[in-house]
Every structure is written in C-alpha cells, then in structure tokens.
Amino acid sequence: MTFNHKTIEELHDLLVKKEISAVELTQATLADIKEREAAVDSFITVSEEEALAQAAALDAKGIDADNLMSGIPLAVKDNISTKGILTTAASKILYNYKPIFDATSVEKLYGKDMIIVGKTNMDEFAMGGSSENSYFKTTKNAWDSSKVPGGSSGGSATAVASGQVRLSLGSDTGGSIRQPASFNGVVGLKPTYGRVSRFGLIAFGSSLDQIGPFSQTVKENAQLLNVISGNDPKDSTSSQEEVPDFTSKIGQDIKGMKIALPKEYMGEGIDSKVKETILAAAKHLESLGAIVEEVSLPHSKYGVAVYYIIASSEASSNLQRFDGIRYGYRAEGIENLEDVYVKSRSEGFGEEVKRRIMLGTFSLSSGYYDAYFKKAGQVRTLIMQDFAKVFEKYDLILGPTAPTVAYDLGSQNQDPVAMYLADLLTIPVNLAGLPGISIPAGFVDGLPVGLQLIGNHFDEATIYQTAAAFEATTDYHKQQPVIFGGEK
C-alpha cells in the first residue's frame, strides 16, 4: 500500500482516525523509497531502524490531533546533522561521521513528532549544481534518468518528485533548493537569511547558507516552514523576527499585487522556450489580477562573480576543520603531522571542493584581498540596494528559476564555469538574503520549468499567497513523472 499521493492534511486525518498507524505509514514510505531508489538514487542513508522505532513510540504515545505533522515521514539533506545517523555531506572526508547532536531544524522536526526516514544525496559540501559531485553516487532526474536532478540538494528534490517522500529538507547557498525544485517539478523555498537556524548545518558559505523545505504543493511547503522557523540562541545569525503562520495568506486573491519582472532575468543566456514559459506564467498572474511590470536590477550581472569569491572564501575558512585528526577520514601511510593534513585533505576532498578551497584561499590572500574579497563585498551591497529599490514599489519579483531545463548527466563536468553560470538567476537572492521559491510553471521538451518568485525580507507569506494562487489555477503541480505514476 502507498500513501504518497495523499496530502499532509489527508495523511493527518487518516492517522488521527486510526485508519493507519504511524508505523504503517512509515513502512509504506520505506517501501516507496526502496521501490524507486534504483531509478533516482536519492538517498545516501535510509534510516529504517530509527524511523520505525520512532513511529512505534509515537503509536504508543498517540497521534496528537492538534499537531498536523505528527507521524509524517520526511527526508533530510545529508549536510544537516542528525544524532546517531550518518551525516556525510556527500564527502569521503566524512564517510563515517555520526554526529552526537541534532541540528536545530532536526530538533524542531522531532519536536513535532515528524519521522526522518533517511538522508539525501547532494553535491559534496553543497558545492555544485548537478548532484554529480557526490563521493557516494549520482542522483538522477525524476523525469528523465539521463538528465541531472540539479543541485546541490538533488536527492531532496528527487525524493519528493519521484514519490519516495512527501516532504524533505534541503539547503540553499546559491540556488541549491530552488534549482533542483525547478528541474524536478516540485516546490522548493529558500527562506529569508536568518529565518531558519543554521546550527547543525555543515557550513559552506556562512553568510549565504539557509535550510528550507521541498514539497509537492505550496501549502505543504508553508506547513513545513512553520515547523523549522524561529530564533535559535545557538545561531547568532538567526533572526528575532516573529514567525507568522506561513499558510495565513494562502487562498487570498492577488488582485492588485504588484510584481516586478527584471529585464536582466529574461536576457542573454536564458533558453527561449524557458523564457516563453515564464512570460506565459506572468500573463497568467495578470489574469488573476496581479500587475506585472518590467524593472531593472542592473548589478545582478555581477552576481555570479561576487558569489564565487564570497562563497569560496567562506568555504576555505569553514572547511579548515576537516583535518584528518578530530573526525572523519584519515589517510594511511602517515609519517608526520603535515602528512596527516595534506594527505587526508587531498584524498578526502573531491575535485570541486578542492577547486573552491583554492579559489577562496587565493581571494583572501595578502595582496589580493582588496581586489577580490573586499570588492566582492562592495558589489554585494549594490546588489542588495537594487533589490531594496524594487521592493519600495513592488510586492514580489518574478523570473525563471534556472536559465534552462535539466541538462544531460556528465555534460558540464569538464566546464565548471558553465555550471557556475547556470545559477545566475538564483545567486542574487542569496547575496541579498531574500526569500525565494520555485514552483512548477510548465514544461519544455517534457522537462519541468520552475517559476521563481522572490519576496522582501521575512515576507515568505506573500510568496506563498501568490504561488498558491498560481498553483490553484494551473495543473502543472499535478503532472507527475512516470516513476510517480505519471503518463509517458
């Protein structure tokens, strides 16, 4: 028996009425994972034993009728710490690492009696846009196994898109939730920087990283964000801002909503069919009463360059802790202390991670700091100011999530710069610390296209309101890949 076509509210109803137990729902989810895993390779670890034990304890305690998430299974990206469950960040250097603590976001999941069924595959240390940089396996797109799933949260996206789980958590440093959501036709949101605690997230770029939800529908996405949001004394960058009910505006119409369409988001490098799909989505929002107008974000063209200096610099610092001494992989044939560091890091890190550590170390080095890192910080401020100016007059910004649909596996491995440029539409949102969502908006050559909606700081509720209005009047989110029972 499978329950993966049922919404969270429908599953909650079944659990409360005792038509199914938490153990039965967890067993069904584990069966869905096993059945589809060979086709998509979403998971690094399936935590069957822990999940079933948790479900059994919940059945003994009883489902809380007032807690929508009680007994709901989900998957978690493998760079989010889970006590006693392997957390590798898809790296050889952490191949055997079991944290002794839970990330705050995981604590919040457990606090709502949610059941973690496994840890999803990703690009190593979240560095990449295709999930091909994993030490363990290559995740495949849920719609076409010859295509990339996007990255770095590829496994979290394919787990939802293929019907293995209804919900998952990912992390987004430069588009790592939104781009795989776009490539797999699911809903993925990067919250405002500081909305969700980063404590327990294995750091890549500390001023950019943010944990966020994947789901089948907009409402379920908001329901999961309700669980994981809030201030955390363990994360000094987590916000004191009050957490609203993110579902509160869902169902409200969008008449008079002012939406900006930056001309830079529809320019050079954007596939013509993707552009047509997004313009059609903009027209559809206009038909619902929104006002869509063209604007300019002049400094967004520098976003990719700025991002790769800042993110790589932060990574070169953050990844110094993986030294072969405290935990994780240690090379053999060691003769002295320097050997421990050099060999363990050389053998333990993959090529892309080493590339970014070198780039970041160079950007921070004496003589280049002013020309690169300092300058990147100044341009980042200009990018933030561009957004602030637009949000003085507009409620949201609209554009494609990615410039293309999913591309062939292996096609960009030898050209890292081409892969970096694929994030040009998502990166500015991280640089400015803004919230952004990707929702299904159509298909090009049988592959999903994501519509990106960007909101002002801490205004996720307006993003969800507009995304839900679009979803309620289109059927793109109802179209499923063959692996999930869709039509060929």
UniProtKB/Swiss-Prot annotation:
This is Glutamyl-tRNA(Gln) amidotransferase subunit A. Coiled coil: none annotated. Belongs to the amidase family. GatA subfamily. PANTHER family: GLUTAMYL-TRNA(GLN) AMIDOTRANSFERASE SUBUNIT A (PTHR11895:SF151), TRANSAMIDASE (PTHR11895). Gene3D superfamilies: Amidase signature (AS) domain (3.90.1300.10). The active site is at K77, S152, S176. SUPFAM superfamilies: Amidase signature (AS) enzymes (SSF75304). Its EC number is 6.3.5.7. It comes from Streptococcus sanguinis (strain SK36).
